[in-house]
Structure formats: structure tokens, C-alpha cells
Amino acid sequence: MSFKDLRSFIDHLEKNGELKRISYPVDPHLEMTEIADRVLRSGGPALLFENPTNHTMPVLVNLFGTPKRVAMALGKDDPLALREVGELLAFLKEPEPPTGFKDAIAKIPMYKQALNMPPKTVRNPPCQQVVKTGDEVDLTSLPIQHCWPGDVAPLVTWGLTITKGPRQKRQNLGIYRQQLLSKNKLIMRWLDHRGGALDFKDFKQLHPGERYPVVVALGSDPVTILGAVTPVPDSMSEYAFAGLLRGERTEVCKAISCDLEVPATSEIILEGYIDPEETAVEGPYGDHTGYYNETDSFPVFTVTHITHRKDAIYHSTYTGRPPDEPAMLGVALNEVFVPILRKQYPEIIDFYLPPEGCSYRMAVISIRKQYPGHAKRVMMGAWSFLRQFMYTKFIVVVDDDVNCRDWQDVIWAITTRMDPIRDTMMVDNTPIDYLDFASPVAGLGSKMGLDATNKWPGETTREWGTPIVMDEKTKQRIDQIWDDLGIQDMPTL
């Protein structure tokens, strides 16, 4: 099942008990965050606040608040089915010619999906049913959440920022938080390595002093939103990838003020520009780390046009100490990463990003070990293979007899198969999340790899221990007589 717009997905969630409408008046200032946080931590539904205080536009939160809803957005029933998305990405990252007739037949579904890649331009799009320009532009009329007591101002959180670099054929979609400055200005917080910032940098080099056109889409269809947070190959547009996931082309339309293409069924579109000479201090804001971040200067986005659907819905979220919505997205996208990593490193059995690790700061990898030093090779490969993992501070590698998603198993492996000096690899002066205030320098810090695998000759000269396992004959015998023993069922430790 695919969803043409956000509204059809909302209807689907509501029919399946995954969305709750809140008619009671709730304030976007702090109150929505507290309610959403309580509901998310209990595994509850998405919430549609129909009567936000001092506003007429409904607010949608916790849309991707469980891995199940992320899977539902992509037409899947189970988060594990998201590995199919990873298999598609692995195919796109390293497309190989068929090795024979049978291989060609097997790859036909992939080639069919590729035909859905180019976006489809439509006229009279829903996102331009209402057009506001000049003095009509008023960002304060939107029910923008003020999430935490220490936040400096309301914050746009789920906007898809659309840019195009002068050296790129494709447009880029990225999600960058945006601080409300005034009725027509936001601060665009994009970090230097992100696609939008790189496009802007290239534009300034080729067009010094000129205004850079930017568009922000709010409330796009769920597949396009998820396409913007998935590790799409740099050469591919997120629109094209969304078409692959959806099984049909992404509908776009031309923005009113520039040539950028926007998702046609979006709820709200903000059009405008960035003046290369205009910056402002952003923050502080509570972030996904569970702390307020430092302030820093970023470009100012001046909004010249607001277009939206009739009876538009404002899509929002908050970030805080995990679990939050980004952490739940990370749990779901974890399944996407597994096939991509296996494509490059077939010895990988499983890969896990624990949500407590702020989505990506810690990873645990289980491998089928084949030679001394193998774990360290996998660590270095993971850090360098995908852009998402350059911020991963800690990687633990375990053997295939250890469940990398079970902390009891992982801690047992660390404490019994590791020597702290021999099996710890430290790498300094590496890229680190700018929000990580624990690093010595903003954006630059160290990484730690922990080899918790069994050690091979060459890694140790000692006789290595053999895990204790009861023989199958005895276990079967006890299974047979268990009920006769009169021992009540006991809780699992």
C-alpha cells in the first residue's frame, strides 16, 4: 500500500488504531511536547491536536513514534521488512551487470522499480491551493512548537529543505531545524557536511553575493519524508528514491518563486532565499542527546511566499533524551542498514544501533570471524562506508554466537573476550557530531572500537575458553519430564 499524501496516511493510521485525535485545546508552547513525550515513551499512537491554543491549524506529532509506523509508512507490516529497502539501496549503490540469464531474471523486479525513479510534474497542485505573499507572509500564524523550557524560540522541526547546487543535476532534500526569528525569517541550521550546506557553498563560489533560492516543504507524503532521512546514493535525488519505494513516480510541482520542484501534495510550502551575507545566532535548543546545545551562527532563510492546502495540517516533532522520534526512526532504519553493510562486508551477521545511543553514536556488529584482526577491519569499514556512521563514537564487534541486540549477551562478550589494551582501538581527530559537547573540539573528536570476539592464534598465545553448553540429549530429557517436576513457570531473567 502506498500513500499519495499525508492525509491518506493519517486516515490509514486512524483506521488501524495508530492515531488519536485530541479535541481538547493544547498549547504548542511546551504542552504538546510533554503530552507527545509521555505517549511515545509508552509506545502510543500518533497524535493530531485539532485545537492548538491560539491557532486554527491542527498539529500532527509522533507520526513515526514507533518502528511499526515507520514500516506502515512504507507499506510494510513489520519493521524487519524494511530490509527490503536496504537491499534496494545496496543494489543502487553497487549495481552489477547480471552474471547470467538466471541472475538477469532475478534482477527484473529491481529494474522495474528503477522505471519509477523520475518525478512527475503536475499542474494545479494541492500545496498551492492557498498562496500568500508580501505582508500576508506570517510564520507566527503557524502553530510552531516551542518544545522545551530552555529553548530560545519556537522551532520548525519536520521541514524538508529543498536545494540545488550549481554542479548537481539532482535536487537535494534534507531535514534541518529552523529557529523562528520573525514573521518572515528562520535560521537554517545545516551543518557543513550536509547536502543543503554543500549546495549553498557551491552556489556562493559560482555566484558570489547573490541570493540562494530555498524551499521548505512541511507535511509531505510519508515516503518522501522517509526518503529524506535514508542513506540515498549522493548521485540520486530523494524524489527518485521515494518513487522507487512507493512503486510510482513522486508527484512534484514548480515552486512559485523559483525553479525548485516541491512535493505536490505537501500541506505547507515555504519559499524564499538565503542572503549569503545574513547570518544569526541559533539556539540554545534541547536536542536528541538529552541536553541543550551550544549556540552558533547559521544562515538566515527569508520567506517570501507561503503556500498551503485548504485546511492544512502542521507536521511537527520534538527531540530530547531517547527515546524520542528520531531514536524510533533510527531503530527502524537500522534494518535498512543491515543489507547495505552486508553487500560490502558479507561476513556481517547483524548490525544494531541501540536507541539509547542517540540513534547512531554507538553500534554493535556481529560477524562470522575469519582471521586475526578481522574485527578491526570491520570497525574501520563501518566508520568509513556510510556518511551516517562517521559520527558513531563507539563500535563493538562480537562473534556470531552473540546476539548483538541483547545487552546481556554483549556485556558477557565484552567482559570475557576482551583485554582492554589489546582489544581496544582508539582513533583521534575524526568527525564528530557538532552537538556532542563531550568532544574536545566542536565537530572533531575520537572514536573507540571494542573487539569482543574470540581471539585467534596471532591475537593471543593462551588457550582460549570454550563456552559452556548443555548437550541436546539432556535438554530433551528435561523437556520431557518438566511438567512432572512440579516446578511452576518462572520469569525470564
Curated annotation (Swiss-Prot):
Which keywords appear in this protein's UniProt record, sorted alphabetically? Cell membrane, Decarboxylase, Flavoprotein, FMN, Lyase, Manganese, Membrane, Metal-binding, Ubiquinone biosynthesis
Q: Which gene encodes it?
A: ubiD
> What compartments host this protein?
Cell membrane
**What pathway, per the record?**
Cofactor biosynthesis; ubiquinone biosynthesis
Q: Which InterPro entries match?
A: UbiD, UbiD-like_C, UbiD-like_N, UbiD_bacteria, UbiD_Rift_dom
Assembly state and interactors?
Homohexamer.
Belongs to which family? Answer: Belongs to the UbiD family.
- What is the membrane topology here? Peripheral membrane protein
Q: What is this protein called?
A: 3-octaprenyl-4-hydroxybenzoate carboxy-lyase
Binding-site residues, Mn(2+)? N172, E238
Q: What is its EC number?
A: 4.1.1.98
Task: Give one GO molecular function term.
Answer: 3-octaprenyl-4-hydroxybenzoate carboxy-lyase activity
The family database entries (Pfam families) matched by this protein are listed as:
UbiD, UbiD_C, UbiD_N
Function summary? Catalyzes the decarboxylation of 3-octaprenyl-4-hydroxy benzoate to 2-octaprenylphenol, an intermediate step in ubiquinone biosynthesis.
Active site residues per record: D287
Cofactor stoichiometry and binding remark: Binds 1 prenylated FMN per subunit.
Binding residues annotated for prenylated FMN, in chain numbering:
I175, Y176, R177, R189, W190, L191, R194, G195
Entry GO terms, CC: cytosol; plasma membrane
Required co-factor?
Answer: prenylated FMN; Mn(2+)
Keyword Cell membrane found = yes
Taxonomy of origin reads: Bacteria, Pseudomonadati, Pseudomonadota, Gammaproteobacteria, Alteromonadales
